[in-house]
From Swiss-Prot:
Keywords: ATP-binding, Ligase, Magnesium, Manganese, Metal-binding, Nucleotide-binding, Purine biosynthesis. ATP binds at residues 134-195. One of its GO terms (molecular function) is metal ion binding. Its cofactor is Mg(2+); Mn(2+). Binds 1 Mg(2+) or Mn(2+) ion per subunit. Its EC number is 6.3.4.13. The keyword Magnesium applies. This is Phosphoribosylamine--glycine ligase. Pfam families: GARS_A, GARS_C, GARS_N. One of its GO terms (biological process) is purine nucleobase biosynthetic process.
Length: 420
């Protein structure tokens, strides 16, 4: 079969690469993709993620069996609804089901309604009311833009002043446009964060290995929030009993709740969780695979990914099998200045071979050659599997030391929480 992946980042590179491993898959197209993907035999289609009718026409003309949608903004724009109306299958939630991600307030209301553990909160569109709530609650406190903001719409404020300023930027200064026209202000939860993913169709779901992401830009969890600077799986200090509790108290009730609400869920459900003294609680839901978690989870899958997704799409039982030993770890290399203003056009090191995989995100070919240049905030990610976190760190970081990363930066402590 021929498949289409919508998106352009490292996540979509990992999805397409894994689908291409299937003996049943003849071709994988990515729209619009990035030039780095072509080094793995992936074909790029020059159609943007918002061009739904062009994507639908391409899928029809090229006999695409189904489409895997990567990015949150495409889902929020109703791409899956449009494909389904055209009689095409797409793996991803409808616009209404994806509201779990594109409105933090909606997600909070659903969690309250169905008794799902999460932080106490208030939602505000009026700055003075938000300010009064912050002053009443005190700090630390978390201020979130209600809508999509590329993973950068969350401020963990250490002081009341910092929280008020974050609310002011969103509500009065229009920092995130319509996405920040409402803010959700939450109690700060202390604990270990982890990412739980499930492949879902209605009440049928399959839990993936649990990963830990590193959101802050710099070592020691310093600096601004980013889309993610690295991740690893498995999380050795997270007992299976915690995952089981999260499935019972969070995943099952949210999926049942969405069915009750008439928003039955299809696709990847991503629960960003935190292990508190009261057990796991939800920080956020996302309606798609995480980036960079996808790049470390999918290499551990030993079953046929294309067959698994095909089965789930058609509501057939499927069997996902995984590497059950060792650790897979990945480090993101980003452009200097990210997540704020960053440089572009930096020459990238050669693609790695052997047991270190390179997944590309912001990369393009130079005008007159096949040299890859940086073309985004997060540029590429190196991923490897080893017996222990330390072994994986050693492999990745020794490779990075040998690369010319002028104009780029990366965190040097990915996975270190697991080796304390």
């Amino acid at each position: 079969m021929k498949l289409l992946v919508v998106g352009s980042g490292g996540r979509e590179h990992a999805i397409a690469k894994k689908l291409l491993e299937s003996e049943q898959v003849e071709q994988v197209f990515v729209a619009p993709g990035n030039d780095g993907m072509t080094l793995d035999g992936i074909e790029l289609i020059n159609i943007g993620i918002s061009e739904h009718s062009a994507l639908i026409n391409f899928a029809k003309e090229n006999d695409i069996a189904w489409t895997f949608v990567g990015p949150d903004d495409a889902l929020a724009a109703g791409i899956v609804d449009d494909f389904e109306q055209a009689g095409l299958k797409a793996f991803g939630p409808s616009r209404l089901a994806a509201e779990l991600e594109w409105s933090k307030d909606f997600a909070k209301q659903i969690m309250v309604k169905y008794g799902i553990p999460t932080a106490a909160f208030g939602t505000f569109s009026n700055f003075e009311e938000a300010k009064a709530y912050i002053e009443e609650q005190g700090a630390p406190i978390v201020v979130k833009a209600d809508g999509l903001a590329l993973g950068k719409g969350v401020v963990v404020a250490e002081t009341v002043e910092q929280a008020v300023e974050a609310a002011r930027e969103m509500l009065l200064d229009n920092k995130f446009g319509d996405s920040g026209a409402r803010v959700v202000i939450e109690e700060f939860l202390a604990g270990e964060e982890f990412s739980l993913f499930a492949l879902v169709n209605g009440d049928q779901f399959y839990i993936l290995p649990t990963a830990q992401d590193h959101k802050r830009a710099f070592d020691g969890d310093q600096g601004p929030n980013t889309g993610g600077m690295g991740a690893y799986v498995h999380v050795p200090h997270l007992p299976q009993s915690v995952v089981d509790t999260a499935v019972d108290t969070i995943v099952k009730p949210i999926l049942e709740g969405m069915i009750t609400e008439g928003r039955s869920y299809l696709g990847v459900l991503y629960a960003g969780l935190i292990l508190t003294d009261q057990g796991p609680k939800v920080i956020e839901f996302n309606a798609r695979f995480g980036d960079p978690e996808t790049q470390i989870i999918l290499p551990r899958l030993t079953s046929d990914f294309a067959q698994n997704i095909d089965d789930i799409l058609h509501k057939r039982p499927t069997q996902l099998t995984w590497l059950n030993s060792g650790v897979t770890l990945g480090v993101v290399v980003a452009s200097n200045g990210y997540p704020l203003d960053y440089e572009k056009g930096v020459t990238l090191p050669a693609k790695t071979e052997g047991d270190i995989t390179t997944y590309y995100a912001g990369a393009r070919f130079a005008e007159n050659s096949r040299a890859l240049l940086s073309n985004g905030g997060r540029v590429y990610m190196l991923v490897t599997t080893a017996d222990t976190v330390q072994d994986a760190q050693e492999k990745i970081y020794s490779e990075l030391k040998n690369q010319d990363t002028t104009g780029l930066f990366y965190r040097t402590d990915i996975g270190s929480k697991a080796v304390k």
